[in-house]
Amino acid sequence: MKREILLERIDKLKQLMPWYVLEYYQSKLAVPYSFTTLYEYLKEYDRFFSWVLESGISNADKISDIPLSVLENMSKKDMESFILYLRERPLLNANTTKQGVSQTTINRTLSALSSLYKYLTEEVENDQGEPYFYRNVMKKVSTKKKKETLAARAENIKQKLFLGDETAGFLTYIDQEHPQQLSNRALSSFNKNKERDLAIIALLLASGVRLSEAVNLDLRDLNLKMMVIDVTRKGGKRDSVNVAAFAKPYLENYLAIRNQRYKTEKTDTALFLTLYRGVPNRIDASSVEKMVAKYSEDFKVRVTPHKLRHTLATRLYDATKSQVLVSHQLGHASTQVTDLYTHIVNDEQKNALDSL
C-alpha cells in the first residue's frame, strides 16, 4: 500500500476512535511502531468497539464516545463472547464455506487488544503518575496456537526456501531469464525498476532483515564498503546488520542509476524509491511483497519476503551450525526462535533411518 494511502486510511480510523486509543496511537508511534502495524491495530479496534456497541455492552452512540470504564469493567465472559462472535461471523471470512475467521486472525485481534490493555494498565500515566486502571482482562484470556511440531513446520517451510544454489539462481533468473518471457510492453516496465528490484531481493537474501526494516532504510544506513546496514528493529532498537558479499554488485548497480532514474532531490533520503506521478517516494512494503511474489512464482514457488529471511537464516545455520550467530543476524534476543532452522537442515535423523 502506498504510504499516502496508508496514512489517509489511518486518519479515517483515528477519527472514529476514543481519546484513549488516540493516546495509545501517539505513544506507539514514538516507539516507533510502523504505520502498517498501527493501521492493522486500528482496524482491530474498530472491529472490537463496533461489537461493543452492537452487543449493548456500551450504550454510547458511537465508538469515539465509548468511555474508558467500559474497558476497565470488561469481564472475561464479555471477552469470550467477542471471541465467539469472531468465530461465528461468516462475513469476516472470504471463504464462505467457513463459519468464522481463522484462529490466526483471532490471535491477531487478541494481540492488538492485549497491547492496548497493557498500555492502559501498565504504561500510561495519569496526573498522579498511575495507569488509567489496573485490571487487565486480557491476561485472563487464553489463545489457541496452531498445533504443529517444529519438524512439521520446518518441512512445510523448506519447500518455500531458495537454498544452496537456488539463492544465486533466483537472482540470475530475474536478471537474465525473466526478461526473455516478457512482451515488449512488459519488458519496458520491467527495465524501469530492474536494478532496484534486484537490489531489494538480493539484500533480503543476503541479510535476512525483515521487510519493514528493508523498506525503511535510508541511504545513510548503507555502508557499501563494509557491507553493513543500520536498521531499526522491532521495539525501535537500532542494530547493525552484516550483508553477504553476493549482494554488493546488485546494490552497486542500483545506486549507479538511483538518482537519475528516480529523479531524486537532496531531500529524498530513502534508499529504495519508486516514482509516483514523476515524484520519487519511498517504496512501500506491499509493492515489495507483490514484486517478490511475482518473481518467485515464475521462478519456482510463490513466496513472501519473510521466506527470504528464512532462506538466509537456514543457509547461515547450515554453514555455521551456530544458533547464536543466526539469532544475532536476525535480531532475536533468544536462540529459541532459531530452533526451526536446526530442523530444516538436520539430515542426521534421515541418514540414520536410511541406514536401518
From Swiss-Prot:
Q: What is this protein called?
A: Tyrosine recombinase XerS
Notes on how activity is controlled: FtsK is required for recombination.
Q: What is the lineage of its organism?
A: Bacteria, Bacillati, Bacillota, Bacilli, Lactobacillales
Active-site residues per Swiss-Prot or TrEMBL entry = R210, K234, H306, R309, H332, Y341
Q: Which residues form the Core-binding (CB) domain?
A: 16-121
Tyr recombinase domain span: 169-354
- Tell me which species this is from: Streptococcus pneumoniae (strain P1031)
Keyword Cell cycle belongs to the record:
yes
For this protein, the record's NCBIfam families field holds: PRK05084.1
Which GO molecular function annotation, any one, does this entry have? tyrosine-based site-specific recombinase activity
Q: Which InterPro entries match?
A: CB (IPR044068), DNA_brk_join_enz (IPR011010), Integrase-like_cat_sf (IPR013762), Integrase_catalytic (IPR002104), Integrase_recombinase_N (IPR010998), Integrase_SAM-like_N (IPR004107), Recomb_XerS (IPR023670), Tyrosine_recombinase_XerCD (IPR050090)
Which cell locations does it reside in? Cytoplasm
Q: Does the keyword Cell division apply?
A: yes
Keywords annotated in UniProt: Cell cycle, Cell division, Chromosome partition, Cytoplasm, DNA integration, DNA recombination, DNA-binding
